[in-house]
Amino acid sequence: MQSMVCNDFVGLQTAVDVDHFTSSIQNFLPDVSVRERRGIATIDTNDRQFHAKAYPIGIHPQRVQEIAISNKAQRAYAQTQKIVNGRQIILRVDRVEPTKNIVRGLLAFELLLDQHPELVKEVCFVLMLVPSREGVTRYRRYATSITKLVQKINDKFGEKVVINVQGNNQGRALAAMREYDVMLVNSIIDGMHLGAKEGAVVNENDGVLVISRTAGVYQEMENGASLGIVPTDIQETADSLYKVLREMTPQERHKMSTKAARIASSHTVIDWLADQLKDLQGIIIPEDIDEPVAATIIPCANINNDSDNRPSSVRRLPRTEPPPLIPDMLVSEQIANQ
């Protein structure tokens, strides 16, 4: 927080993030006023003025489409495609990261098959998982719990209903995205989740996004471009998967997937960068301000030490304890200990 207020502009992923940021500033810093106009928050402190705005990051649609249809990507996906063997696909593409809520996603899939056993031979759950922070004990335990749960589900239903593909291979993941019926993004919290945008752009099967309402991408996809879920609600997640697979008409799926693709393509990563560069040139300043606020250089180099060179409006924030284990980690540890 101390470093962020030293900037002239602070870019965040979503409007909700901007609201949280400005609220935090008002809680931690004295004599702060915040006003908003046209999506731009202007923050005044004792010493200076700066701005905050949402810049939702985009993708490079043309590039991801080229990769998805490349021969290299198809070769990388061929073995997984063979195991799928014509079944409907629920897909997730994520790092092995507790906030991604992978365990609950698997539990929702297990519940789906428990409640609708006719789907056992007709649907598979393809996991494209990238190992992450393997040197951290909690992450290793989380990865182990995923592996155990995958095995448990496959043993339970007597089929390879979950296909667990490990490794960082963008081409393989994008090739899989071309075929999904459902792409599941049930993160506990996520700044954006670009994989959802990539999936929307490359999918050729009228696939539908099922997205956590706490993922940044949902703020762009919530109005008719996806199905929203509460990430901790396993039953709602299972119901949403079933809705796409068996209740939505082909026309409904086509309409939703087309809208998602249009949204994901409409604001690219190039636009995202250009918007920030444009705003940094002063165009962001609202029209009701008589003249642009000049960039202000303030002594923030020593912001993290006890120097008195800090602006008076910037005070040291209290140290906090590390956050507790997030709920999905607790669920996964119970599985790992079984």
PLM region spans:
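Catalytic cores of carbohydrate-active enzymes across secretory and cytosolic contexts
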Residues: M1-N337
